[in-house]
Amino acid sequence: MRVKEQLLTLRAYVPGKNIEEVKREYGLSKIVKLASNENPFGCSARVTEALTSLASQYALYPDGHAFELRTKVAKHLGVKAEQLLFGSGLDEVIQMISRALLHEGTNVVMANPTFSQYHHHAVIEGAEVREVSLKDGIHDLDAMLQQVDDQTKIVWICNPNNPTGTYVEKQKLLSFLESVPKSALVIMDEAYYEYAGAEDYPQTLPLLEKYENLMVLRTFSKAYGLAAFRIGYAVGNTELIGQLEVARLPFNTSTVAQSVALAALEDQAFLQECVKKNEEGLHQYYAFCKEYNVFYYPSQTNFIFLKLGIPGNEAFERLMKKGYIVRSGAAFGIDDGIRITVGLKEENDEIIELLKELVNEQVQKEETYS
């Protein structure tokens, strides 16, 4: 028995190494994971409180329509409840959209590098993938527009982008939306939306009324600190969302996930404190990069992508041996970079000292051979 031919060309998603795996592999007792862009400050205390009240519901199926969460999220965003589609993390939302819209003979347009699951699910559905290289680390919307044709079903824009942390400016997005054919669905993946503080970062939800071919994705995994519970959602026009509901698995978001998302949503003070501390953490890395002349992309997320002057895999391995897990840029096709999640202040301080050692060693090598 053989699976789809498309599956034979793909590899299963490989996440960042987990803590227990690294402990076993390197014989370490203390590990700091800065690889998967998780919230180092955890989640709201209200989440813990919500969990204690759920024991009596474990034997029951969840609300398949997520009515209470749907209502609260809609109110929070200022949209209609019918505009929301919930999934088990944005991974499932991306899968649902791809399954519903793509097939052989269609194509998708996206940046490179960007979040890998856009490409992954397009290939599974038999669609052509048209990738456009980033320009100075940012989506090149002009070049992406040139790749769009009558068979383009989806244009993916990860904003802010993973793995670079960069963003598309408001005016450039508006120009793109005015130019792109209405037959192509433009999806703004805003998984890191809560961290984006740039003045010209586009606020996309108000644009949904004007652009029916626009959709916005958001998640509770990042700034809200609920990655373990797997819950994200799409916001779009009611007709399309209603059609996509057909592709959604029954009971796809658990009672636990819905309950903790509600609790997290109600604690905006905790969220804002996390965002504030994250910004302070980013500036720790900026100061290091400027002092040591290390290339980096200014970030609108909770991670930073930088280049130390050595292969990303080498930096990854050497940091891991010291107990720090990051992501090698090689995983994204950028062999000379690494992506580091912003951690607690002391974690940032500690890994920055290790980064300084790597940079100094490289400088000494270059001086030796010069």
Swiss-Prot record:
Domain of life of the native organism: Bacteria
Keyword Secreted included in the entry's annotation: no
Modified residues (N6-(pyridoxal phosphate)lysine): K222
One GO BP annotation of this record: L-histidine biosynthetic process
InterPro entries: Aminotrans_II_pyridoxalP_BS, Aminotransferase_I/II_large, HisP_aminotrans, HistidinolP_aminotransfase, PyrdxlP-dep_Trfase, PyrdxlP-dep_Trfase_major, PyrdxlP-dep_Trfase_small
Cofactor(s) of this protein: pyridoxal 5'-phosphate
Enzyme Commission designation: 2.6.1.9
Catalytic activity annotation: L-histidinol phosphate + 2-oxoglutarate = 3-(imidazol-4-yl)-2-oxopropyl phosphate + L-glutamate
Gene Ontology MF: a single term: pyridoxal phosphate binding
CDD domains the UniProt entry points to: AAT_like
Keywords: Amino-acid biosynthesis, Aminotransferase, Histidine biosynthesis, Pyridoxal phosphate, Transferase
Biological pathway: Amino-acid biosynthesis; L-histidine biosynthesis; L-histidine from 5-phospho-alpha-D-ribose 1-diphosphate: step 7/9
Top enzyme class: transferase
Family according to the record: Belongs to the class-II pyridoxal-phosphate-dependent aminotransferase family. Histidinol-phosphate aminotransferase subfamily.
Subunit structure as annotated in this protein's UniProt entry: Homodimer.
Protein name in UniProt: Histidinol-phosphate aminotransferase 1
Lineage of origin: Bacteria, Bacillati, Bacillota, Bacilli, Bacillales
